A protein has these predicted regions:
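Short low-complexity stretches enriched in small and charged residues
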Residues: 17-31, 52-57, 96-102, 156-163
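Short, flexible, solvent-exposed loop/turn segments with mixed acidic/basic and small polar residues
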Residues: 1-5, 84-90
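Vicinal oxygen chelate
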Residues: 1-6, 10-18, 61-68, 86-103, 108-163
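Conserved short beta-strand elements that form part of the metal-binding/catalytic scaffold
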Residues: 34-85, 128-150
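Long, hydrophobic N-terminal alpha-helical segment
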Residues: 1-49
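Extended intrinsically disordered, low-complexity coil regions enriched in Ser, Thr, Gly, Ala
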Residues: 21-41, 87-91, 102-126
Protein backbone atom coordinates (compact mmCIF):
# COMPACT_ATOMS: atom_id res chain seq x y z
CA UNK A 1 0.00 0.00 0.00
CA UNK A 2 1.10 3.56 -0.68
CA UNK A 3 2.17 5.95 2.05
CA UNK A 4 0.54 8.84 0.15
CA UNK A 5 -2.59 10.32 1.71
CA UNK A 6 -5.88 9.00 0.42
CA UNK A 7 -7.56 11.00 -2.34
CA UNK A 8 -9.98 13.74 -1.39
CA UNK A 9 -10.84 15.40 1.89
CA UNK A 10 -11.71 13.47 5.05
CA UNK A 11 -15.14 14.56 6.26
CA UNK A 12 -17.08 11.61 7.68
CA UNK A 13 -17.11 8.78 10.20
CA UNK A 14 -19.67 6.15 9.27
CA UNK A 15 -21.34 3.84 11.76
CA UNK A 16 -23.46 0.81 10.94
CA UNK A 17 -25.96 -0.19 13.61
CA UNK A 18 -28.74 -2.77 14.01
CA UNK A 19 -31.19 -0.10 15.24
CA UNK A 20 -30.98 3.48 13.98
CA UNK A 21 -32.75 5.13 16.93
CA UNK A 22 -30.56 3.33 19.49
CA UNK A 23 -27.44 4.22 17.51
CA UNK A 24 -28.40 7.90 17.40
CA UNK A 25 -29.17 7.92 21.13
CA UNK A 26 -25.74 6.41 21.81
CA UNK A 27 -23.94 9.03 19.70
CA UNK A 28 -25.92 11.87 21.26
CA UNK A 29 -25.02 10.65 24.75
CA UNK A 30 -21.37 10.00 23.87
CA UNK A 31 -20.61 13.03 21.69
CA UNK A 32 -23.30 15.56 22.44
CA UNK A 33 -24.15 15.52 18.75
CA UNK A 34 -26.96 17.86 17.79
CA UNK A 35 -29.98 16.49 16.00
CA UNK A 36 -29.55 14.25 13.01
CA UNK A 37 -31.40 14.35 9.69
CA UNK A 38 -32.99 10.91 9.29
CA UNK A 39 -33.76 9.34 5.90
CA UNK A 40 -35.73 6.10 5.98
CA UNK A 41 -35.64 3.15 3.61
CA UNK A 42 -33.45 4.65 0.92
CA UNK A 43 -32.76 2.38 -2.05
CA UNK A 44 -29.38 2.97 -3.67
CA UNK A 45 -29.48 3.73 -7.40
CA UNK A 46 -27.19 1.59 -9.57
CA UNK A 47 -26.37 -0.58 -6.57
CA UNK A 48 -23.44 -2.97 -6.92
CA UNK A 49 -22.00 -5.26 -4.22
CA UNK A 50 -19.06 -7.67 -4.44
CA UNK A 51 -19.15 -8.20 -8.17
CA UNK A 52 -22.76 -7.83 -9.19
CA UNK A 53 -25.93 -5.74 -9.20
CA UNK A 54 -27.54 -5.35 -5.78
CA UNK A 55 -30.69 -3.89 -4.28
CA UNK A 56 -29.39 -1.98 -1.27
CA UNK A 57 -32.09 -0.64 1.04
CA UNK A 58 -31.10 1.17 4.22
CA UNK A 59 -32.09 3.92 6.61
CA UNK A 60 -29.51 6.53 7.52
CA UNK A 61 -28.96 9.67 9.52
CA UNK A 62 -26.48 12.52 9.22
CA UNK A 63 -25.23 14.90 11.90
CA UNK A 64 -22.14 16.94 12.70
CA UNK A 65 -19.84 17.36 15.65
CA UNK A 66 -17.70 20.35 14.70
CA UNK A 67 -16.57 19.83 11.12
CA UNK A 68 -16.84 16.04 11.23
CA UNK A 69 -19.95 14.45 9.82
CA UNK A 70 -21.35 11.33 11.44
CA UNK A 71 -23.35 9.01 9.20
CA UNK A 72 -25.35 6.29 10.94
CA UNK A 73 -26.70 3.46 8.77
CA UNK A 74 -29.18 0.69 9.51
CA UNK A 75 -29.48 -1.94 6.76
CA UNK A 76 -33.11 -2.71 5.87
CA UNK A 77 -32.98 -5.25 3.01
CA UNK A 78 -30.64 -6.70 0.42
CA UNK A 79 -27.02 -7.72 0.37
CA UNK A 80 -24.67 -4.90 1.25
CA UNK A 81 -21.49 -4.03 3.07
CA UNK A 82 -23.76 -2.77 5.87
CA UNK A 83 -25.49 -6.15 6.39
CA UNK A 84 -22.15 -7.93 6.02
CA UNK A 85 -20.66 -5.69 8.74
CA UNK A 86 -23.47 -6.51 11.18
CA UNK A 87 -22.91 -10.22 10.53
CA UNK A 88 -19.36 -9.71 11.87
CA UNK A 89 -20.15 -7.04 14.49
CA UNK A 90 -23.77 -7.62 15.62
CA UNK A 91 -23.86 -4.61 17.96
CA UNK A 92 -22.56 -2.30 15.23
CA UNK A 93 -19.72 0.19 15.28
CA UNK A 94 -17.43 2.26 13.08
CA UNK A 95 -17.76 0.96 9.53
CA UNK A 96 -15.96 3.52 7.36
CA UNK A 97 -14.07 6.78 7.00
CA UNK A 98 -15.48 9.01 4.26
CA UNK A 99 -13.50 11.16 1.83
CA UNK A 100 -15.10 13.74 -0.46
CA UNK A 101 -13.57 13.77 -3.95
CA UNK A 102 -14.01 15.99 -7.00
CA UNK A 103 -13.27 13.20 -9.50
CA UNK A 104 -14.83 9.90 -8.45
CA UNK A 105 -13.37 7.89 -11.34
CA UNK A 106 -9.82 9.15 -10.76
CA UNK A 107 -10.09 8.49 -7.01
CA UNK A 108 -11.38 4.97 -7.69
CA UNK A 109 -8.49 4.30 -10.08
CA UNK A 110 -6.04 5.64 -7.47
CA UNK A 111 -7.34 3.35 -4.73
CA UNK A 112 -7.42 0.30 -7.01
CA UNK A 113 -3.81 1.01 -8.06
CA UNK A 114 -2.84 1.04 -4.37
CA UNK A 115 -4.32 -2.43 -3.90
CA UNK A 116 -7.68 -1.48 -2.41
CA UNK A 117 -10.65 -3.66 -3.37
CA UNK A 118 -13.98 -2.11 -4.38
CA UNK A 119 -16.73 -3.76 -2.33
CA UNK A 120 -19.85 -1.67 -2.98
CA UNK A 121 -20.86 1.31 -5.08
CA UNK A 122 -23.93 3.23 -6.08
CA UNK A 123 -25.43 6.61 -6.84
CA UNK A 124 -28.01 9.05 -5.52
CA UNK A 125 -28.79 11.46 -8.34
CA UNK A 126 -25.39 12.71 -9.50
CA UNK A 127 -23.72 11.76 -6.20
CA UNK A 128 -21.45 8.71 -6.60
CA UNK A 129 -20.00 6.63 -3.78
CA UNK A 130 -17.86 3.54 -3.34
CA UNK A 131 -16.63 1.51 -0.38
CA UNK A 132 -13.16 0.00 -0.47
CA UNK A 133 -11.33 -2.44 1.77
CA UNK A 134 -7.61 -3.00 2.15
CA UNK A 135 -5.31 -5.36 3.98
CA UNK A 136 -3.75 -2.27 5.64
CA UNK A 137 -6.94 -1.52 7.53
CA UNK A 138 -9.00 -4.71 7.78
CA UNK A 139 -11.48 -3.35 10.34
CA UNK A 140 -12.59 -0.10 8.72
CA UNK A 141 -13.57 0.58 5.13
CA UNK A 142 -12.72 3.66 3.11
CA UNK A 143 -15.55 5.45 1.33
CA UNK A 144 -14.99 7.89 -1.48
CA UNK A 145 -17.89 10.05 -2.52
CA UNK A 146 -18.49 12.69 -5.15
CA UNK A 147 -21.17 15.01 -3.74
CA UNK A 148 -23.52 16.67 -6.22
CA UNK A 149 -24.85 20.19 -5.56
CA UNK A 150 -28.07 18.91 -3.96
CA UNK A 151 -26.26 16.70 -1.45
CA UNK A 152 -23.67 19.41 -0.69
CA UNK A 153 -26.55 21.78 0.06
CA UNK A 154 -28.28 19.20 2.26
CA UNK A 155 -25.07 18.61 4.21
CA UNK A 156 -24.58 22.37 4.68
CA UNK A 157 -28.11 22.63 6.10
CA UNK A 158 -27.48 19.69 8.44
CA UNK A 159 -24.25 21.25 9.69
CA UNK A 160 -26.01 24.60 10.23
CA UNK A 161 -28.98 22.78 11.82
CA UNK A 162 -31.35 24.56 9.41
CA UNK A 163 -33.30 21.54 8.19
Amino acid sequence: MSSRPLPGTFFQIGYVVPNLEAGLAHLNAKLGAPRFMVLREIVVENGWFRGGPATINHSMAFGYVGDVQFEVIEPVAGNSTYAEFLDRVPDGGVHHLGFSVEDYDAATADLLARGYKLVQRGTFGDTKFGYFESSDDPGTMTEIVYLDANVRGMFANIKAQTF
